[in-house]
Amino acid sequence: RYAQPGLPGEEREFYLELRLIADVGLVGFPNAGKSTLLKALTRANPKIASYPFTTLDPNLGVANAGLPTQFIIADIPGIIEGASEGKGLGIEFLKHIERTRLLVLVVDFANDDPVESERILLGELASFSESLPAKPLIRVGNKMDLPEAREKASAHSGYIPVSAATHEGTVALLNAITEQLSRMDKA
């Protein structure tokens, strides 16, 4: 057999941007306990430390323990005020939650003012993308193992009280997520 020489080939460079696809996105300030919550809800093993921006890349976990369905949860790095304008690598972080179906707003009840935290976080989401404020939202008040968090919880009934560190309230949160995703599937 004899092969004939082919024609010169083409060469091109492409830059692809990967955006995570997950069912649920955990959104909150640095040190709100998002990575600890991901670990409590799934079998994921993200890096956890008590300094801001421990999480620099999104972490994924699959929640399925004893649930009628399984779903993927994305823990994105902490959002700070000005994130939608690129402050603190905010745009790099926010783009990952655009493709989630449901947002879980994680607020540190031990240290933050829940109303102000929610205002800032939802404002950053709205400034980044028109589609993000339209997504279903579950509010979580984290760090309920601390006395100062419990004091605030009674005044803020719209939040599911959770302690990611002790797993208190995680079953209620998983049930709320499952119910919301189920309603969305039926719609």
Regions found by a protein language model. Name each.
Residues 1-83, 87, 91, 95-97, ...:
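Conserved G1/Walker A P-loop phosphate-binding module
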Residues 68-71, 101-102, 135-138:
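Loop/turn-to-beta-strand initiation segments
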Residues 135-138, 145-187:
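Canonical P-loop GTPase G-domain recognition
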Residues 99-120, 131-133, 144-149:
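Conserved Switch II/interswitch segment of TRAFAC-class P-loop GTPases
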Residues 102-105, 126, 130, 175-186:
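Non-catalytic alpha-helical coupling and interface elements of nucleotide-dependent molecular machines
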Residues 89, 93, 118-129:
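Conserved catalytic-core segment of NTP-binding enzymes
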Residues 21, 62, 77-80, 108-114, ...:
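Conserved nucleotide-binding/hydrolysis micro-motifs of P-loop NTPases
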Residues 73, 106, 140:
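Generic enzyme active-site microenvironment
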